[in-house]
Amino acid sequence: MGDWGFLEKLLDQVQEHSTVVGKIWLTVLFIFRILILGLAGESVWGDEQSDFECNTAQPGCTNVCYDQAFPISHIRYWVLQFLFVSTPTLIYLGHVIYLSRREERLRQKEGELRALPSKDLHVERALAAIEHQMAKISVAEDGRLRIRGALMGTYVVSVLCKSVLEAGFLYGQWRLYGWTMEPVFVCQRAPCPHIVDCYVSRPTEKTIFIIFMLVVGVISLVLNLLELVHLLCRCVSREIKARRDHDARPAQGSASDPYPEQVFFYLPMGEGPSSPPCPTYNGLSSTEQNWANLTTEERLTSSRPPPFVNTAPQGGRKSPSRPNSSASKKQYV
């Protein structure tokens, strides 16, 4: 086993930008895979080739049978599995680091532009472009990047790749070795002169270790699938919330209108069928009554004697004359 310190540090940084299920997956990867394999793997599989014995004295037959029984060592196969399964996570970590550095550069550039004493149109456009780019990088209050936008796409792709690689390595282990370690391996391969029986050391202990690593691999695969479901539900809930907020904005705007719309009731101007007619005097309408009053007044005026008229009025003023009949008609009509 090599030094896993560098890989552990990288995956520890990924844990800060992962979901709850992703953190559990990292815990399973560290404790139940890397540490146990590093501590117990060498002691269990260290004598794999040295204690592989065959009942023949033919030179080279034991090595050929060992190559047929174990095309690749279990330890090396699991190491390759860890490296391949961890690679998508490392790619996601690279995306996180890239976005973090980009966000820092944008903030630094924004500070330099805002510090300028005079701001022309080009500076305002540059600030607007920087704000638009920073809006795509969602940063939490504690400084961590939120899994949204392009980062969400990278995270989903990494989880999918981990699931496919995990399932592929589990299938490959089953095709190469099976799920148990047989104590006797029958070999018939040149340069062996005949069918040779070869014996494996501590087969029961190795079988237990194989089953343990198999269970851990299945748990890791299930966690990856659960994380995909978690991400899908998270995206759907966020989309539903965004639609609700979008639908609620017009209602809130109408409620805060300082001049709300009022409802007025309009009564018909015409007379309804149940409204009583206007009262009349002596069966006459108002216009006919006015004409009758005017005619009566003219008759009374013609029957009176004419008033005394001064030929030379004092002060040069004329006495006001009575309005003529046309003016009276206009008055009463």
From Swiss-Prot:
GO terms for biological process: blood vessel development; cell communication. A connexon is composed of a hexamer of connexins. Keywords: Cell junction, Cell membrane, Gap junction, Membrane, Transmembrane, Transmembrane helix. It comes from the Eukaryota. Residues 1-20, 100-148, 232-333 are cytoplasmic. Residues 321-333 have a biased composition (Polar residues). Belongs to the connexin family. Alpha-type (group II) subfamily. This is Gap junction alpha-4 protein. Changing C54Q: Requires 2 nucleotide substitutions. Residues 292-333 are annotated as: Disordered. One of its GO terms (cellular component) is connexin complex. The chain crosses the membrane at residues 21-40, 77-99, 149-171, 209-231. The keyword DNA damage does not apply. Residues 41-76, 172-208 are extracellular. One gap junction consists of a cluster of closely packed pairs of transmembrane channels, the connexons, through which materials of low MW diffuse from one cell to a neighboring cell. It is found in: Cell membrane; Cell junction, Gap junction. It is a multi-pass membrane protein. Highly expressed in lung. It holds the Pfam family Connexin.
